[in-house]
């Protein structure tokens, strides 16, 4: 038996599907029927006469109460793959639309996509119903892209002002020479499809477009992308761009990398691409962890590229000219004497008087006045994470025999591992040869081979990497050391699985690379030395 509610719903549906003329005539006949009062014979006759030419109509309206949470169209109508369009997907439309001018062939394409987001995505870079076009890119590299004013205005306040504001101009074509086509397409894809598609080679241009057209969520995504891909190779360029885009968080992240990995950053190709203002900021930096001769050589490399940018001959005079007052930000008097004598003094950039005065600064009791900053940079103070609560030694251990001691660790903030603190001999002074290594998922990130002397105490002795290694948060890295020495060594006890070092939390776990007995509870590699 059909449920009453279901019957009423079917009646309501049937009524709504009737033509308006039928509905109106039906309602009039109903009024006539009710005029006669409570069910007299004349009323019945009138009703029968009135409806003789029309089918009986059921238009009872019931009240629908929705107590449950409102569902979206996709929840009510789960997406099904049409039998006659097996290859038609939103992803394929996105791929097709990257090449522009794609009209939808199916007359009922709207029915293929249950959500407004999916239907909107079909319009991305599509000439169908487009009411504006953009000519994007510099002369000689332009691309004509279609747009839909309503969609663009919903996604950007700048587009809203352009198309619907008080000063809106009714233009069918808008030229945008200062934005790259790929970046503009990435912004359109976000506005139309609610998808963020970023690439390393276009993310800066996309950030510029997002800033220009005030699309804040896309801009934030670009900044996050840049932060996660930040390294010594691109830190200087990103520093310059972050200042231009007024992104203080990204600027701070760049400085952290540049300070800790200063020599790598200064030797990178990107350093030569920075503007003069950024160059001054870096040369003025108090916390650079770099030898001053490296800073000097980096400045000369920048000057050479700057001469090319200004179409100047590559002469010593022009290099000094483009450096200008920034030359005096290099702390030449703080170099090691050998570095100065064999490097800066013979570069030709310094005048004869400057060279003589700096030599006197090194050797004379009465030092001359210099235009150069003569105070050494402070650099960064390394932090030490000690993972053992005590150490000990016994008559039959710890021996090495060329075996690997290894431990895995993870941090909750980005840090830069500068080296390890290692134990020394428990039998008096001794020399050790140490090969230290840092890996992530089997890939070697840093290694070094060096020697160190121990004095017989239970202290730890630092062994450094050539350059600090950047460590990303929430990922386990493997620290390994192979020691070679004849004497017995101290070893750690009462190891901790988690250690708090300032604002950084370090977690430890055993490593399968360890073949000499080191683990979380005891063994070697008692300290991680890092910058944070």
From Swiss-Prot:
The UniProt entry, under CDD domains, shows:
BACK_BTBD3 (cd18524), BTB_POZ_BTBD3 (cd18348)
Which Gene Ontology cellular-component terms appear in the entry? cytosol; nucleus
Q: Which domain of life is it from?
A: Eukaryota
Question: Which Gene Ontology terms describe the biological processes this protein takes part in?
Answer: cerebral cortex development; dendrite morphogenesis
Could you tell me which SMART domains the record lists for this protein? Answer: BACK, BTB
Q: Which residues form the BTB domain?
A: 130-200
Identify the main location.
Answer: cytoplasm
What keyword terms does UniProt attach to this protein?
Cytoplasm, Neurogenesis, Nucleus
Compositionally biased spans, kind Low complexity: 43-53
Report the locations given in the UniProt record: Cytoplasm, Cytosol; Nucleus
Sequence ranges assigned to domain BACK in this UniProt record: 245-310
Role this protein plays: Acts as a key regulator of dendritic field orientation during development of sensory cortex. Also directs dendrites toward active axon terminals when ectopically expressed.
Q: What is the designated name of this protein?
A: BTB/POZ domain-containing protein 3
Q: Where does this protein come from, organism-wise?
A: Mustela putorius furo (European domestic ferret)
